[in-house]
Amino acid sequence: RDRLRSRGLGDVYKRQVMGKTSLAAFISVCPKIDTVKIKGRGQRSIDSFVEYVKKEFPQIKTITVCETMEEAIRDSDIISTTTCVGDKEILFPYIDEKWIKEGALVCMPSAARFDESFYLDKNTKLVVDNYKLYEAWAEEYPYPSYDPVQIVGCKFMDLLHDKKITRDEIIDVADVITGKLAGRENDKQRIIYSVGGMPVEDIAWGETVYKRALELGIGVKLHLWDEPELH
């Protein structure tokens, strides 16, 4: 369903660049967002983030710096986590499912710790950017893979390993985009979207930046070899 009416964003971040770019992405597709709630780590980075929002998105009417995760998450239509975490799930920032409103999108290019009941709830939809990416991670980092990889889609794979969910409960976003599978099915459904990152996106952006540099006549050409080692 169309969620362009989303108005509130709760941003829990420690990686500030990712927090900023995530916010820009959300606003590009949800232009009615007028409230941003922030939970950061240090005052300097929080101040920098607030200034960024004021400068880049003057349409944002309310910017709230939150003292707790709960304050940032409650009543938010979109929840974004860009956190740095420890090497065990028990050390990941905890998010109580009771804080997450019905119909919210939880967008995660990082890790957090949820109660298992949240993942298994019939009103929670598990979505990944590319299922085969997580399949490869699960092979490279054997169960439990969420600890070392620290992307929430790996938690989905751990639940699949434990037979607590089935393969068809992990939705590939490409299938939603192409209409093969449904996205949001009702206004109460909460979606947790795992963003692992895909090399094809890096290649596409790399080409865009390269062509732009050629147009502007900037950059430095590097001499990598006289002839390739393998030919």
Sequence positions of predicted segments:
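NAD(P)-binding Rossmann-fold cofactor-contacting core
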Residues: 29-56
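Short acidic low-complexity segments
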Residues: 61-75, 93-95
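Single conserved hydrophobic/aromatic residue that forms the stacking wall/gate
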Residues: 2-9, 13
